[in-house]
Amino acid sequence: FKTGTPPRVDGRTVDFDELELQPGEGGGYRFGAYAQEDIPEQRPCWVTWAGDALKEVVRDNLDRSALYGGSIAGRGPRDCPSIEDKVVRFPDAPRHQVFLEPEGLHTEELYVNGLSTSLPAEVQLAFLRTLPGMKDVRMTKGGYAIEYDYFPPHQLRHTLELKDVPGLYFAGQVNGTTGYEEAAGQGVVAGINAALRVRGEDPFILERDQAYIGVLIDDLVTRGVDEPYRLFTSRAEFRLLLRQDNAHRRLGPLARERGLLTGVQTEALEQRIREEDRVAVWFRDTALRPEAVAGVLEEAGTRPISEPVRAVELLRRPRVSAAQLLEVGNADGVTASADALAAVEVEDNASTGHHAVRIVAE
């Protein structure tokens, strides 16, 4: 297979006044479900566009591209075409979107997403300087493409152990996948199983209805790959059950059973689940009076009620939030964190959907 990367540039040489600001969505998402981490302020991205001038530079130098000059012939990820591919395959496209992404919180270097290339460095600098806001840009690292070998993953068990070589585990690009998260997920599973094997314990296998990692590994070992594999929600038939908000419920108990959580993390997990269950019971069992919710329903633009209705049923109405219902109907002094309220909202909406009901039944 083949893969590539775009150039990096010095953000101090970019005129951001000519670019479109792309702020993050916020939300305070965390990698860990077991601690209240300090989340640093998110840095925005910026959008610029590759137009006719850039396409002309690329076309004039196609013979110098490793991808088009015959040096690299492997198959690359279909969803991440190089700028050479975009120019050749979509000649009538008036322009191509380019994102400038900060490489980190404490650096001025920007990742030029959308311009993966194998052209020489001087050509890359030439086409970068055709972009709006980048006429004086300084390139800090050039993009490049590589060709690599992989092991057909049907040779692996669901533990990522090689069938013919007990004790040898493969993870990442060597299995035919592409992407950071794909590699990291395999590394977690391979590492856990290698440790369990040394300890003589049962293997750790995630099913397709338990985790996206389970979908990824099952696809690899049962179907194999004929192109670099990237995981999408569309590959998961249980995707309504595999959500960010319930990851701790799906995977936390498994991690606890295998000794992957500290005592502090275990207590945090159990406390979070207890809180979510307590809030869910309140919404399920509490009937709200018409006069209590009249203002909330009017603000949401939905019809009023004439008799008490359970909070969980009102929550299914558009633009009605769990926080609003808890505030107006909370005679018992029930408190709830933002995470617990979000879990109630998403869980009810997802679990009552036709597709979710069907797949749970199956």
Q: In which residue ranges do the predicted regions lie?
A:
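Flexible, glycine/charged-enriched surface loops at secondary-structure junctions
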Residues: 2, 68-75, 134-142, 201-206
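Glycine-rich phosphate/pyrophosphate-binding beta-alpha loops
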Residues: 173-181, 237-239
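Acidic/histidine-rich catalytic neighborhood
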Residues: 14-30, 199-299
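Internal hydrophobic alpha-helix adjacent to the cofactor/substrate pocket in enzyme cavities
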Residues: 183-206
